UniProtKB/Swiss-Prot annotation:
Similarity comment: Belongs to the glycosyltransferase 2 family.
UniProt key word Disulfide bond: no
Pathway annotation from the record: Glycan biosynthesis; alginate biosynthesis
Name of the protein in question: Glycosyltransferase alg8
GO BP, sorted A to Z: alginic acid biosynthetic process; extracellular matrix assembly; hyaluronan biosynthetic process
Length: 492
């Protein structure tokens, strides 16, 4: 019955969306489609060749990797058999201020994977609360793993995830792992699906210079449906983009949910990079990275000469807890953290150079810097054009948005993700609101905060420096936005 209700709800949603699309098409004045009309010429200019060409390239590369290249790697590893087995597997989980129900699910799945994978395995628990330790010990006794599976606790002070990771890495280094050992870093809200370890770690034998993230999906139990839908759209887009970048062995992030490394994590230089990462900014000065440990680990691997890869058939579930009950406020908070981490990495990643990153990766990193403006180009021109000329321009833009987001939604389904009638709206919401948040955070890279706990970066600056950073950020945001709008008003 629930499945029938869901199917009827989805069908109703699609009918409403398609009906709205037809109404917009009917409301569109015929002269908009006249090639002689200046409105038609303007509409063509709104398409945004750069943005859509990058999207098409990512999609084609992603499908090539997903259905051709990755299956080739998988077949090669399967032929190796036992020769692809690692000498030891370390499953390190970091937990802080996560509810007991989620913690139980996470550690239960990790211990089961340690038992079922068949490799010598050590579960490393980087935890703060004694209650977590007691819960893990009770799960350990209940599941009763064999002698080849060990348990190692690392108690941390609760000063942040970076310290938890660094202490966990040092605990692993004390085991003195050899070069064939593999380390999986797992977030405290990540539930491992069955077989994820066996699907992942053997690939290192064929790709000896890699550390990579695993594919992720969302668990519906921890948030409202609209939060879940947004996360599903984001994961579907990330899935295609990661497949595209994996074609160049340059996946641009080692997702904090689950990443797998060679024992390079025991390198003191790598540990310091994760624990005490910082950025020197020409206006804001030097500041530490509070969030974005996954970006720090990616940058460190790139700098140390390693490559990154993606395993699309190794799935995990994440228990997502929205930071706010209100959808818009929660999404803004999450975007502020995501895009802040992205831009803080981006500003220095390009300095690694084309020889290290490759041409395509360098172009993608550049696109990340300009996409905050190109994403707003169509909407801004449509508003200006409708004010200066005719409301028909905005109606044409609305039709274009609905049509293209419908096509994008259908393309997302080719990645193996389910789609729904809300996806076109969510795609556009993410584009516009995401671009605005990105512009805001671009001029405030020193402002960082966690969404799970109320922790913010306190730089303890002198009063003048704090005042200067605050007002210069506002001034630069206003100036950049004014120039953007002025150029478009003169061009339209």
């Amino acid at each position: 019955m629930d499945r029938l209700k869901h199917a009827l709800g989805e069908a109703t949603g699609w009918l409403l969306f398609l009906s709205f699309l037809m109404l917009v098409a009917v409301a569109l004045p015929p002269q908009v489609f006249d090639p002689e009309s200046k409105h038609f010429i303007m509409l063509i200019g709104l398409i945004g060749v750069w943005r859509y060409s990058m999207g098409i390239i990512h999609f084609l590369r992603g499908m090539l990797f997903l259905y051709v290249v990755y299956p080739y790697y998988r077949r090669k590893v399967e032929k190796l058999g036992k020769d692809a087995d690692p000498s030891h597997v370390f499953l390190m989980v970091t937990s802080f201020r996560i509810d007991a129900l989620t913690t139980g699910k996470v550690y239960g799945s990790v211990i089961k994977e340690a038992i079922n994978c068949g490799y010598p395995t050590t579960v490393v628990c980087s935890i703060v609360e004694m209650s977590d330790e007691l819960l893990i010990k009770s799960l350990w006794e209940k599941l009763d793993p064999p002698d080849r599976v060990k348990l190692d606790f690392v108690r941390i002070a609760g000063t942040g995830k970076r310290d938890g990771l660094a202490n966990g890495f040092r605990a692993i280094s004390r085991h003195m792992p050899d070069e064939d050992a593999v380390v999986a870093v797992i977030d405290g809200d990540t539930v491992l699906n069955e077989g994820v370890v066996r699907k992942t770690v053997p690939l290192f034998q064929d790709l000896p210079q890699h550390g990579w993230p695993d594919h992720q999906r969302i668990l519906r139990s921890a948030g409202r449906l609209r939060h879940e839908r947004v996360a599903q759209v984001r994961f579907a887009q990330r899935h295609i983009n990661m497949c595209s970048m994996a074609l160049s062995h340059r996946v641009l992030t080692l997702t904090g949910r689950m990443s797998v490394f060679r024992a390079v994590v025991t390198d003191p230089e790598f540990i310091v990079d994760v624990e005490n990462d910082n950025l020197d900014h020409w206006r804001l000065g030097r500041f530490k990275f509070l969030t974005g440990d996954d970006k720090s680990s990616w940058f460190s691997l790139m700098r140390l000469g390693y490559d990154t890869f993606y395993v699309p058939d190794a799935s995990i579930h994440t228990v997502e807890h929205p930071p706010e009950k209100r959808f818009v406020k929660a999404s803004r908070k999450l975007m502020f953290r995501w895009y802040g981490n992205n831009l803080r990495q981006n500003s220095r990643a390009l300095k690694l150079g084309v020889q290290r990153l490759g041409w395509f990766t360098s172009v993608v990193l550049f696109d990340q810097r300009v996409s905050m403006w190109t994403s707003l180009l169509g909407l801004t021109v449509a508003i200006i054009g409708s004010i200066k000329y005719s409301i028909a321009i905005f109606i044409a833009y609305l039709l274009w948005v609905c049509s293209t987001r419908l096509v994008l939604t259908l393309l997302l389904s080719l990645s193996g993700h389910p789609i729904g009638p809300a996806y076109p709206l969510i795609l556009y919401y993410n584009q516009i609101v995401g671009a605005v948040v990105k512009i805001h955070v671009f001029f405030r890279l020193d402002q960082q905060s966690w969404t799970r706990q109320d922790t913010k970066l306190n730089r303890e600056l002198a009063s003048f420096q704090s005042w200067f950073n605050n007002w210069s950020s506002k001034a630069m945001t206003f100036s950049a936005t004014s120039i953007f709008i002025a150029v478009l008003m003169l061009s339209v």
